[in-house]
């Protein structure tokens, strides 16, 4: 399985299908003032105009209700074209990933930028298994919710609370911290989701059983009985 040819090739810049020069800056005229803005080429899809300096240069801001024409950041992870029905992760069509890759393989792809080898996947799965348990105090956190609370806000609240129990990986500028927090979230979300469901139906929580893989473990914690 291979990504779409050319994905991630930032050197392939020319003209788009509207004939716009993808290498040129953009000149914006506001009254008598002309402001030059940078053009940010896209590896696929539409290019963008860099308006980050617009306020300083021209004293104005952009207005784009709903951010219909605004990209919040550049991304090498996801490409979406809703009108054309296209969704790609790291260059791979979502249909291809759904048919040929497991949940953990796609998770690895999103985090590290490439599909894992068999050894890398095994190591990744083992690492996730070391983080499936919840701190016991976080487990008791669920007791504060009414039984008829919808599982989604319960899950969202528990996820927000995780950082108060795991304060050794909170620096967003430290790649090691980001990686550890990502692994923890992947490992603990199935446990949190299962606990939220068990709370809603009045059944006792089940601890993770790491003899199972991630998906089997989630099903066990969600639907199993003591």
Could you tell me what each predicted segment is?
Residues 6-21:
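Short, Lys/Arg-enriched N-terminal segments with co-localized hydrophobic residues
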Residues 23-226:
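Hydrophobic alpha-helical bundle cores within soluble ligand-binding/oligomerization subdomains
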């Amino acid at each position: 399985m291979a990504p779409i040819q050319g994905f991630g090739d930032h050197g392939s810049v020319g003209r788009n299908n509207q004939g716009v020069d993808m290498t040129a800056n953009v000149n914006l005229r506001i009254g008598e003032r002309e402001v030059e803005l940078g053009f940010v080429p896209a590896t696929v899809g539409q290019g963008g105009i860099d308006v980050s300096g617009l306020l300083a240069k021209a004293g104005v801001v952009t207005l784009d209700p709903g951010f219909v024409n605004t990209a919040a950041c550049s991304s090498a992870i996801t490409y979406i074209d809703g009108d054309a029905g296209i969704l790609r992760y790291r260059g791979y069509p979502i249909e291809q990933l759904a048919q040929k890759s497991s949940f953990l393989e796609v998770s690895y792809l999103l985090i590290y930028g490439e599909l894992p080898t068999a050894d890398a996947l095994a190591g990744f799965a083992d690492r996730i298994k070391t983080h499936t348990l919840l701190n016991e105090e976080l487990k008791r956190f669920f007791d504060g919710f009414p039984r008829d609370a919808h599982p989604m806000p319960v899950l969202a609240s528990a996820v927000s609370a995780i950082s108060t129990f795991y304060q050794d990986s909170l620096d967003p500028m430290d790649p090691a911290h980001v990686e550890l927090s990502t692994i923890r979230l992947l490992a603990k979300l199935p446990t949190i989701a299962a606990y939220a469901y068990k709370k809603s139906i009045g059944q006792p929580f089940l601890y993770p059983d790491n003899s199972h893989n991630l998906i089997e473990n989630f099903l066990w914690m969600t639907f199993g009985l003591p």
